[in-house]
Curated annotation (Swiss-Prot):
Residues 7-34, 76-96 form a coiled coil. Transmembrane segments: none annotated. Belongs to the pole-localizer TmaR family. It is found in: Cytoplasm. This is Pole-localizer protein TmaR. InterPro entries: DUF496. Pole-localizer protein involved in the regulation of several cellular processes. One of its GO terms (cellular component) is cytosol. The keyword Phosphoprotein does not apply.
């Protein structure tokens, strides 16, 4: 019985470490994107530009990123719906299997 608890404990620890690793990878990816964004901004800004031109570039970039965020939110909703549909189908199949097995 204690080995079962140890297995469960180790599995939970492994899952926690996996989540931490994914979270850390996300932070690395996000910071790399910030570096790329700043490099792109430096490419667009020229010494002869006015303040208004620089602000216009930044506003345009902001709008582009907001559109991307919206696209990702929509994609996440679609993925979540697909996961719910799959979970529902698995429950249905499990129930069918239980009913079929119970009749034998």
């Amino acid at each position: 019985m204690s080995s079962v608890f140890e297995i469960v404990n180790q599995a939970r620890r492994k899952n926690k470490l996996k989540r931490e690793l994914l979270d850390n990878e996300k932070k690395v990816r996000d910071n790399r994107k910030r570096v790329d964004l700043l490099e792109n901004l430096l490419d667009y800004i020229k010494p002869e530009m006015t303040h208004d031109e620089i602000v216009a570039i930044i506003k345009n970039m902001k709008a582009d990123y907001e559109d991307r965020v919206d696209d990702h939110i929509i994609k996440s909703a679609e993925i979540s719906k697909a996961r719910r549909d799959i979970s529902r189908r698995i429950r249905e199949l499990t129930e069918e299997d239980k009913q079929t097995s119970g009749k034998k």
